[in-house]
From Swiss-Prot:
Keyword Endoplasmic reticulum: no
Keywords: ATP-binding, Cytoplasm, Magnesium, Metal-binding, Nucleotide-binding, One-carbon metabolism, Potassium, Transferase
Source domain of life: Bacteria
Chief location: cytoplasm
Record InterPro entries: ADOMET_SYNTHASE_CS (IPR022631), S-AdoMet_synt_C (IPR022630), S-AdoMet_synt_central (IPR022629), S-AdoMet_synt_N (IPR022628), S-AdoMet_synthetase (IPR002133), S-AdoMet_synthetase_sfam (IPR022636)
Designated gene of the protein: metK
Any one of the GO CC terms: cytosol
Family: Belongs to the AdoMet synthase family.
Protein name: S-adenosylmethionine synthase
Organism from which the protein derives: Vibrio cholerae serotype O1 (strain ATCC 39315 / El Tor Inaba N16961)
Protein backbone atom coordinates (compact mmCIF):
# COMPACT_ATOMS: atom_id res chain seq x y z
CA UNK A 1 0.00 0.00 0.00
CA UNK A 2 1.25 3.49 -0.81
CA UNK A 3 2.45 5.26 2.35
CA UNK A 4 0.59 8.48 1.52
CA UNK A 5 -2.17 8.78 -1.03
CA UNK A 6 -5.33 10.67 -1.96
CA UNK A 7 -8.67 9.04 -2.69
CA UNK A 8 -11.78 10.75 -4.06
CA UNK A 9 -15.45 9.79 -4.31
CA UNK A 10 -18.46 11.68 -5.62
CA UNK A 11 -22.19 11.71 -4.96
CA UNK A 12 -25.17 13.33 -6.65
CA UNK A 13 -28.41 14.69 -5.24
CA UNK A 14 -31.91 13.23 -5.49
CA UNK A 15 -32.61 15.93 -8.10
CA UNK A 16 -29.81 14.81 -10.44
CA UNK A 17 -31.43 13.50 -13.67
CA UNK A 18 -30.01 9.97 -13.34
CA UNK A 19 -31.22 9.81 -9.73
CA UNK A 20 -34.70 11.02 -10.70
CA UNK A 21 -34.79 8.04 -13.06
CA UNK A 22 -33.56 5.64 -10.35
CA UNK A 23 -36.16 6.89 -7.87
CA UNK A 24 -39.04 6.56 -10.34
CA UNK A 25 -37.95 3.00 -11.22
CA UNK A 26 -37.79 2.01 -7.54
CA UNK A 27 -41.06 3.82 -6.72
CA UNK A 28 -42.75 1.65 -9.36
CA UNK A 29 -41.12 -1.47 -7.86
CA UNK A 30 -42.29 -0.54 -4.34
CA UNK A 31 -45.86 0.18 -5.49
CA UNK A 32 -46.03 -3.25 -7.14
CA UNK A 33 -44.45 -5.01 -4.14
CA UNK A 34 -47.07 -3.50 -1.82
CA UNK A 35 -49.66 -5.59 -3.69
CA UNK A 36 -47.61 -8.47 -5.13
CA UNK A 37 -44.27 -9.33 -3.45
CA UNK A 38 -43.70 -12.16 -5.96
CA UNK A 39 -43.81 -9.83 -8.96
CA UNK A 40 -41.03 -9.80 -11.53
CA UNK A 41 -40.00 -6.20 -12.17
CA UNK A 42 -37.35 -4.67 -14.44
CA UNK A 43 -38.31 -1.00 -14.70
CA UNK A 44 -36.19 1.51 -16.62
CA UNK A 45 -36.77 5.27 -16.74
CA UNK A 46 -35.58 8.05 -19.05
CA UNK A 47 -36.06 11.73 -18.20
CA UNK A 48 -35.50 14.79 -20.36
CA UNK A 49 -36.96 18.28 -20.65
CA UNK A 50 -40.72 18.04 -20.15
CA UNK A 51 -40.84 14.24 -20.44
CA UNK A 52 -40.50 10.98 -18.50
CA UNK A 53 -40.52 7.60 -20.26
CA UNK A 54 -41.00 4.48 -18.12
CA UNK A 55 -40.33 1.11 -19.74
CA UNK A 56 -39.14 -2.40 -19.05
CA UNK A 57 -40.60 -5.83 -18.31
CA UNK A 58 -43.07 -6.40 -15.48
CA UNK A 59 -45.04 -9.57 -14.69
CA UNK A 60 -47.50 -9.06 -11.82
CA UNK A 61 -51.06 -9.42 -10.58
CA UNK A 62 -50.88 -5.86 -9.21
CA UNK A 63 -52.27 -2.75 -10.86
CA UNK A 64 -50.41 0.49 -10.27
CA UNK A 65 -50.84 3.97 -11.73
CA UNK A 66 -47.45 4.50 -13.39
CA UNK A 67 -48.23 8.09 -14.34
CA UNK A 68 -49.25 9.14 -10.83
CA UNK A 69 -46.28 7.32 -9.23
CA UNK A 70 -43.97 9.17 -11.63
CA UNK A 71 -45.49 12.59 -10.95
CA UNK A 72 -45.53 12.05 -7.18
CA UNK A 73 -41.86 11.00 -7.16
CA UNK A 74 -40.79 14.07 -9.16
CA UNK A 75 -42.97 16.24 -6.88
CA UNK A 76 -41.31 14.88 -3.72
CA UNK A 77 -37.86 15.57 -5.17
CA UNK A 78 -38.92 19.19 -5.62
CA UNK A 79 -39.42 19.82 -9.34
CA UNK A 80 -42.79 21.56 -9.09
CA UNK A 81 -42.42 24.65 -11.25
CA UNK A 82 -41.36 25.36 -14.82
CA UNK A 83 -38.88 27.96 -13.44
CA UNK A 84 -36.77 24.97 -12.33
CA UNK A 85 -36.77 23.55 -15.86
CA UNK A 86 -39.01 20.61 -14.94
CA UNK A 87 -42.51 20.38 -13.49
CA UNK A 88 -44.08 17.22 -12.06
CA UNK A 89 -47.56 18.53 -12.80
CA UNK A 90 -47.13 19.27 -16.50
CA UNK A 91 -44.42 16.89 -17.79
CA UNK A 92 -45.45 14.17 -20.25
CA UNK A 93 -45.33 10.58 -18.92
CA UNK A 94 -44.91 7.78 -21.49
CA UNK A 95 -45.47 4.15 -20.41
CA UNK A 96 -43.80 1.44 -22.53
CA UNK A 97 -43.84 -1.51 -20.10
CA UNK A 98 -44.09 -5.12 -21.33
CA UNK A 99 -43.93 -8.59 -19.67
CA UNK A 100 -40.93 -10.70 -18.61
CA UNK A 101 -39.79 -13.23 -21.20
CA UNK A 102 -41.13 -16.76 -20.46
CA UNK A 103 -37.65 -18.06 -21.38
CA UNK A 104 -36.18 -16.23 -18.37
CA UNK A 105 -39.14 -17.16 -16.18
CA UNK A 106 -38.71 -20.92 -16.65
CA UNK A 107 -35.11 -20.72 -15.43
CA UNK A 108 -35.98 -18.69 -12.34
CA UNK A 109 -39.23 -20.24 -11.07
CA UNK A 110 -38.89 -23.80 -9.73
CA UNK A 111 -41.35 -26.16 -7.97
CA UNK A 112 -39.21 -25.97 -4.83
CA UNK A 113 -38.72 -22.27 -4.05
CA UNK A 114 -35.34 -23.00 -2.41
CA UNK A 115 -34.10 -24.08 -5.85
CA UNK A 116 -35.06 -20.74 -7.45
CA UNK A 117 -32.48 -20.03 -10.12
CA UNK A 118 -30.58 -16.79 -10.56
CA UNK A 119 -32.37 -14.36 -12.90
CA UNK A 120 -29.19 -13.88 -14.93
CA UNK A 121 -25.50 -14.66 -14.95
CA UNK A 122 -23.19 -12.06 -13.52
CA UNK A 123 -20.60 -10.99 -10.97
CA UNK A 124 -21.32 -8.94 -7.86
CA UNK A 125 -19.06 -7.39 -5.23
CA UNK A 126 -19.62 -6.36 -1.63
CA UNK A 127 -17.22 -4.39 0.55
CA UNK A 128 -16.74 -3.13 4.09
CA UNK A 129 -14.00 -1.23 5.91
CA UNK A 130 -13.71 -0.12 9.53
CA UNK A 131 -12.65 3.45 8.63
CA UNK A 132 -16.15 4.82 9.46
CA UNK A 133 -18.76 3.85 12.05
CA UNK A 134 -21.05 2.53 9.28
CA UNK A 135 -18.19 0.33 7.97
CA UNK A 136 -18.07 2.20 4.66
CA UNK A 137 -15.26 4.12 2.94
CA UNK A 138 -15.14 7.71 4.22
CA UNK A 139 -15.03 9.51 0.84
CA UNK A 140 -18.38 8.17 -0.43
CA UNK A 141 -19.94 8.39 3.06
CA UNK A 142 -19.23 12.11 3.37
CA UNK A 143 -20.03 12.86 -0.28
CA UNK A 144 -23.51 11.39 0.36
CA UNK A 145 -23.91 13.32 3.61
CA UNK A 146 -23.17 16.59 1.81
CA UNK A 147 -25.95 15.80 -0.67
CA UNK A 148 -28.38 14.84 2.10
CA UNK A 149 -27.62 18.14 3.81
CA UNK A 150 -28.17 20.05 0.55
CA UNK A 151 -31.63 18.49 0.25
CA UNK A 152 -32.45 19.17 3.92
CA UNK A 153 -31.62 22.90 3.83
CA UNK A 154 -33.39 23.23 0.47
CA UNK A 155 -36.58 21.58 1.70
CA UNK A 156 -36.74 23.17 5.17
CA UNK A 157 -36.34 26.67 3.76
CA UNK A 158 -32.92 27.46 5.28
CA UNK A 159 -31.57 28.14 1.76
CA UNK A 160 -34.75 28.71 -0.27
CA UNK A 161 -32.86 29.60 -3.47
CA UNK A 162 -31.39 26.10 -3.77
CA UNK A 163 -32.75 23.86 -6.53
CA UNK A 164 -32.86 20.05 -6.58
CA UNK A 165 -29.87 19.23 -8.84
CA UNK A 166 -26.46 19.02 -7.13
CA UNK A 167 -23.18 17.09 -7.01
CA UNK A 168 -20.45 16.64 -4.41
CA UNK A 169 -16.92 15.24 -4.44
CA UNK A 170 -14.58 14.74 -1.49
CA UNK A 171 -10.84 13.94 -1.61
CA UNK A 172 -9.39 12.31 1.51
CA UNK A 173 -5.71 12.13 2.47
CA UNK A 174 -4.46 8.79 3.78
CA UNK A 175 -1.18 7.95 5.50
CA UNK A 176 -0.41 4.22 5.79
CA UNK A 177 -4.05 3.47 5.13
CA UNK A 178 -5.40 5.79 7.85
CA UNK A 179 -7.29 9.05 7.22
CA UNK A 180 -5.26 12.13 8.09
CA UNK A 181 -7.42 14.84 6.53
CA UNK A 182 -9.56 16.13 3.69
CA UNK A 183 -7.59 17.58 0.78
CA UNK A 184 -10.41 18.94 -1.41
CA UNK A 185 -14.18 19.41 -1.46
CA UNK A 186 -16.22 20.07 -4.59
CA UNK A 187 -19.88 21.05 -4.30
CA UNK A 188 -21.98 22.25 -7.22
CA UNK A 189 -25.63 23.05 -6.65
CA UNK A 190 -28.39 24.31 -8.88
CA UNK A 191 -29.84 27.62 -7.68
CA UNK A 192 -32.36 30.29 -8.58
CA UNK A 193 -31.28 33.39 -10.51
CA UNK A 194 -31.80 35.56 -7.42
CA UNK A 195 -28.62 34.64 -5.52
CA UNK A 196 -25.13 36.02 -6.21
CA UNK A 197 -22.19 33.64 -6.57
CA UNK A 198 -20.45 35.14 -3.53
CA UNK A 199 -23.53 34.75 -1.31
CA UNK A 200 -24.12 31.22 -2.57
CA UNK A 201 -20.54 30.16 -1.83
CA UNK A 202 -20.67 31.56 1.70
CA UNK A 203 -24.05 29.95 2.45
CA UNK A 204 -23.02 26.55 1.06
CA UNK A 205 -19.86 26.66 3.17
CA UNK A 206 -21.67 27.61 6.39
CA UNK A 207 -24.90 25.61 6.00
CA UNK A 208 -23.82 22.50 4.06
CA UNK A 209 -20.07 21.84 4.22
CA UNK A 210 -19.16 22.86 7.79
CA UNK A 211 -22.06 21.03 9.50
CA UNK A 212 -21.20 17.78 7.67
CA UNK A 213 -17.41 17.43 7.45
CA UNK A 214 -15.58 16.78 10.76
CA UNK A 215 -13.49 19.82 11.71
CA UNK A 216 -10.46 17.70 12.66
CA UNK A 217 -10.12 16.63 9.02
CA UNK A 218 -10.24 20.19 7.67
CA UNK A 219 -7.23 22.51 7.64
CA UNK A 220 -6.07 25.72 6.01
CA UNK A 221 -4.67 23.52 3.23
CA UNK A 222 -8.10 22.05 2.39
CA UNK A 223 -9.28 23.31 -1.00
CA UNK A 224 -12.94 24.18 -1.65
CA UNK A 225 -14.58 24.38 -5.06
CA UNK A 226 -18.15 25.64 -4.61
CA UNK A 227 -20.02 26.10 -7.91
CA UNK A 228 -16.67 26.55 -9.66
CA UNK A 229 -18.28 27.58 -12.98
CA UNK A 230 -19.99 30.44 -11.13
CA UNK A 231 -23.50 29.72 -12.37
CA UNK A 232 -25.79 26.67 -12.22
CA UNK A 233 -29.35 27.85 -12.91
CA UNK A 234 -30.20 25.41 -15.70
CA UNK A 235 -30.12 21.93 -14.20
CA UNK A 236 -32.10 18.75 -13.72
CA UNK A 237 -33.57 17.08 -16.81
CA UNK A 238 -33.37 20.36 -18.74
CA UNK A 239 -29.58 20.39 -18.34
CA UNK A 240 -28.99 16.67 -18.96
CA UNK A 241 -31.11 13.65 -19.74
CA UNK A 242 -31.29 11.02 -16.99
CA UNK A 243 -31.35 7.22 -17.15
CA UNK A 244 -31.87 4.48 -14.58
CA UNK A 245 -28.66 2.69 -13.61
CA UNK A 246 -26.08 5.29 -14.63
CA UNK A 247 -24.75 6.04 -11.13
CA UNK A 248 -23.55 2.59 -10.09
CA UNK A 249 -20.39 3.83 -8.36
CA UNK A 250 -22.30 6.53 -6.45
CA UNK A 251 -24.77 3.78 -5.46
CA UNK A 252 -22.05 1.53 -4.03
CA UNK A 253 -18.56 2.33 -2.69
CA UNK A 254 -17.45 5.42 -4.60
CA UNK A 255 -14.78 3.47 -6.47
CA UNK A 256 -13.11 2.14 -3.30
CA UNK A 257 -14.17 -1.41 -4.19
CA UNK A 258 -14.70 -3.27 -7.44
CA UNK A 259 -18.08 -3.36 -9.19
CA UNK A 260 -19.63 -6.14 -11.25
CA UNK A 261 -21.36 -3.69 -13.59
CA UNK A 262 -25.00 -4.43 -12.80
CA UNK A 263 -27.25 -1.58 -11.69
CA UNK A 264 -29.81 -1.87 -8.87
CA UNK A 265 -32.82 0.40 -9.27
CA UNK A 266 -36.05 -0.90 -10.79
CA UNK A 267 -35.08 -4.57 -10.29
CA UNK A 268 -36.89 -7.05 -8.04
CA UNK A 269 -34.70 -9.34 -5.86
CA UNK A 270 -34.84 -12.26 -8.33
CA UNK A 271 -32.27 -10.18 -10.22
CA UNK A 272 -28.98 -11.11 -8.56
CA UNK A 273 -27.42 -7.89 -9.88
CA UNK A 274 -29.25 -6.29 -6.98
CA UNK A 275 -29.94 -8.95 -4.35
CA UNK A 276 -26.52 -10.64 -4.47
CA UNK A 277 -24.73 -7.27 -4.30
CA UNK A 278 -26.74 -6.56 -1.14
CA UNK A 279 -25.88 -10.02 0.22
CA UNK A 280 -22.19 -9.52 -0.57
CA UNK A 281 -22.22 -6.24 1.38
CA UNK A 282 -23.98 -8.03 4.28
CA UNK A 283 -21.32 -10.75 4.34
CA UNK A 284 -18.41 -8.29 4.11
CA UNK A 285 -19.88 -6.00 6.77
CA UNK A 286 -20.40 -8.86 9.23
CA UNK A 287 -16.84 -10.11 8.68
CA UNK A 288 -15.47 -6.64 9.49
CA UNK A 289 -17.92 -6.13 12.39
CA UNK A 290 -16.78 -9.48 13.83
CA UNK A 291 -13.17 -8.27 13.83
CA UNK A 292 -12.06 -10.97 11.39
CA UNK A 293 -10.54 -8.29 9.12
CA UNK A 294 -10.26 -4.48 8.89
CA UNK A 295 -11.28 -4.51 5.22
CA UNK A 296 -13.16 -7.15 3.28
CA UNK A 297 -14.34 -7.52 -0.30
CA UNK A 298 -16.60 -10.38 -1.40
CA UNK A 299 -17.16 -11.46 -5.01
CA UNK A 300 -20.11 -13.67 -5.96
CA UNK A 301 -20.98 -15.06 -9.39
CA UNK A 302 -24.06 -16.82 -10.76
CA UNK A 303 -25.32 -18.71 -13.82
CA UNK A 304 -28.84 -18.02 -15.11
CA UNK A 305 -31.33 -20.59 -13.83
CA UNK A 306 -28.87 -22.09 -11.30
CA UNK A 307 -29.38 -21.62 -7.56
CA UNK A 308 -25.90 -22.02 -6.08
CA UNK A 309 -23.30 -19.30 -6.75
CA UNK A 310 -20.73 -20.43 -9.32
CA UNK A 311 -18.01 -18.84 -7.15
CA UNK A 312 -17.39 -17.07 -3.85
CA UNK A 313 -14.21 -15.02 -3.34
CA UNK A 314 -13.03 -13.31 -0.14
CA UNK A 315 -10.29 -10.62 -0.25
CA UNK A 316 -9.07 -9.03 2.97
CA UNK A 317 -6.09 -7.02 1.64
CA UNK A 318 -3.70 -8.39 4.27
CA UNK A 319 -5.86 -7.04 7.13
CA UNK A 320 -7.28 -10.43 8.24
CA UNK A 321 -6.98 -11.41 11.92
CA UNK A 322 -7.67 -15.10 11.21
CA UNK A 323 -6.78 -17.27 8.22
CA UNK A 324 -8.55 -16.83 4.87
CA UNK A 325 -9.64 -20.48 5.09
CA UNK A 326 -11.55 -19.81 8.32
CA UNK A 327 -13.24 -16.75 6.80
CA UNK A 328 -14.28 -18.64 3.65
CA UNK A 329 -15.59 -21.58 5.69
CA UNK A 330 -17.58 -19.14 7.87
CA UNK A 331 -19.14 -17.55 4.78
CA UNK A 332 -20.22 -20.95 3.45
CA UNK A 333 -21.57 -22.05 6.83
CA UNK A 334 -23.49 -18.96 7.97
CA UNK A 335 -24.76 -17.29 4.77
CA UNK A 336 -27.21 -18.85 2.28
CA UNK A 337 -26.23 -17.15 -0.98
CA UNK A 338 -28.73 -18.90 -3.26
CA UNK A 339 -31.28 -16.41 -4.67
CA UNK A 340 -34.14 -17.71 -2.49
CA UNK A 341 -31.87 -18.02 0.54
CA UNK A 342 -30.56 -14.50 0.39
CA UNK A 343 -34.07 -13.09 -0.21
CA UNK A 344 -35.20 -14.83 2.98
CA UNK A 345 -32.03 -14.00 4.93
CA UNK A 346 -32.37 -10.28 4.14
CA UNK A 347 -36.19 -10.09 3.93
CA UNK A 348 -35.98 -8.52 0.46
CA UNK A 349 -39.56 -9.10 -0.72
CA UNK A 350 -40.86 -5.85 0.76
CA UNK A 351 -41.34 -2.30 -0.56
CA UNK A 352 -38.11 -0.73 0.74
CA UNK A 353 -36.37 0.23 -2.47
CA UNK A 354 -37.32 3.81 -3.28
CA UNK A 355 -35.30 5.02 -0.28
CA UNK A 356 -32.21 3.25 -1.64
CA UNK A 357 -32.35 5.15 -4.93
CA UNK A 358 -30.67 8.33 -3.64
CA UNK A 359 -27.71 8.78 -1.24
CA UNK A 360 -26.33 5.26 -1.62
CA UNK A 361 -27.55 1.72 -1.03
CA UNK A 362 -24.97 0.99 1.68
CA UNK A 363 -23.95 2.47 5.03
CA UNK A 364 -27.55 3.34 5.97
CA UNK A 365 -28.73 1.36 8.98
CA UNK A 366 -32.42 1.23 8.01
CA UNK A 367 -31.74 -1.38 5.32
CA UNK A 368 -31.70 -5.10 6.29
CA UNK A 369 -28.41 -5.86 4.51
CA UNK A 370 -26.71 -3.38 6.87
CA UNK A 371 -27.45 -5.50 9.98
CA UNK A 372 -24.45 -6.98 11.80
CA UNK A 373 -26.51 -9.74 13.40
CA UNK A 374 -24.08 -12.47 12.30
CA UNK A 375 -20.98 -10.80 13.78
CA UNK A 376 -21.15 -12.63 17.14
CA UNK A 377 -21.57 -16.01 15.40
CA UNK A 378 -18.59 -15.31 13.17
CA UNK A 379 -16.47 -14.17 16.11
CA UNK A 380 -17.23 -17.37 18.02
CA UNK A 381 -16.58 -19.52 14.95
CA UNK A 382 -13.19 -17.85 14.43
CA UNK A 383 -12.27 -18.11 18.12
CA UNK A 384 -11.96 -14.33 18.50
CA UNK A 385 -12.58 -12.79 21.92
Amino acid sequence: MAIKHLFTSESVSEGHPDKIADQISDAVLDAIFEQDPKARVACETYVKTGMVMVGGEITTSAWVDIEEITRQTVREIGYVHSDMGFDANSCAVLNTIGKQSPDINQGVDKADPKEQGAGDQGIMFGYATNETEVLMPAPITYAHRLMQRQAAVRKNGTLPWLRPDAKSQVTFQYDQGKIVGIDAVVLSTQHSDSISTADLREAVMEEIIKPVLPAEWLSKETKYFINPTGRFVIGGPMGDCGLTGRKIIVDTYGGAARHGGGAFSGKDPSKVDRSAAYAARYVAKNIVAAGMADRCEIQLSYAIGVADPTSIMVETFGTEKVSQEIIIEAVRQFFDLRPYGLQEMLNLLQPIYKKTAAYGHFGREEFPWEATDKAALLRDFAGLK
